[in-house]
């Protein structure tokens, strides 16, 4: 019997999330359109935005949907003077003005968390960084 132990990288989809995706895929409409189908699509998106915001203690306006991690990193980091670790994905390091090395245990020391981009858990090594400060 096999056991999947790479949850740090990717975890199986929860059945509730799968059902929500299936339900959402039945809604056809451009959320920017004013017709009934468009309004239904927009309502679906806005309800999802509010659920996510509530789950993390934010407001709906703070939630931005993107196509993936690379686009998200660009949105968050472009135009900023950011320090990151050499362990980050290229989607992050390509925006960093300086790159920090890790110690022999894979831990990165961050001196200025407000100007830093550092993943908490590395998806390849599973190493958890010890920092808890930062801007959310």
Q: Language-model segments: which ranges?
A:
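Pyridoxal 5′-phosphate
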Residues: 1-136
């Amino acid at each position: 019997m096999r056991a999947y132990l790479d949850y740090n990288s990717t975890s199986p989809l929860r059945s509730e999330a799968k059902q929500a995706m299936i339900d959402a895929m039945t809604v056809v409409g451009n959320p920017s359109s004013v017709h009934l189908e468009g309004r239904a699509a927009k309502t679906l998106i806005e309800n999802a935005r509010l659920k996510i915001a509530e789950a993390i203690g934010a407001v709906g306006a703070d939630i931005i949907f993107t196509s993936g991690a690379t686009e998200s990193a660009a949105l968050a980091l472009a135009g900023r003077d950011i320090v990151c670790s050499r362990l980050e994905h290229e989607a992050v390091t390509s925006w960093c003005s300086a790159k920090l090395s890790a110690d022999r245990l894979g831990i990165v020391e961050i001196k200025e968390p407000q100007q830093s981009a550092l993943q908490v858990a590395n998806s390849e090594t599973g190493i958890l960084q010890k920092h808890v400060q930062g801007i959310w």
